[in-house]
Amino acid sequence: MTLTTKSVFLLLALSLCSGLSGQVTADSWVNWESPPVHPLELVSGSDLLLATNTADAHLEIYNISSGVPVPFLSVPVGIDPVSVRARNATEAWVVNRISDTISIVDLQNGYVRWTLDTADEPADVIFAGTPERAYVSCSGTDEIMVFDPADVTASPEIISLIGEEPRALAKSPDGSTVYCAIFESGNGTTVLGGGFDGGVNVIAFPPNVVS
């Protein structure tokens, strides 16, 4: 997260605290309400279900071998985890939007074995390519960071995007192509079928219906 954004959050927290009577308790917290992107993940090759507990800054790990999710482990991660992806049966990457980090979690022992710093407001991560790379969308800087999972200390490659707030990521079945959903793409498209406005090839707004 940029210094400016962090300053805004700090001022907001201080202003909220100043309006309260008495002292703020030690367990006070601020709900940033970060948007979930990929909060659930079934781990291939295991009986584990992963879930991001955004408000409590934890990765919740469940065992589903009985057909019903049973709590197995709860791992503290960064602030506001919004996405989780399993790299394999023993490792998961958790995207922490407010912390601007990736928590690499050991699923067998239930701890964060490495923390990666990212650009502002990371949103999602996906593994693709040969050799394998980890692609991380950063909505605050409109870019994708490309990490080498085999060497997390190496500097990431940066891919700049045209569009604002890239979020969810997906890949082709063969893993050779990565797709990014952009919240504000600016390409004149919409999911609403409102018809054209005055023949200028712009979808009419605001008809919130499908024609």
Locations of the language-model features?
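Bacterial N-terminal signal peptides
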Residues: 8-19
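Predominantly soluble domains enriched in secretory-pathway, periplasmic, or organellar proteins
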Residues: 22-211
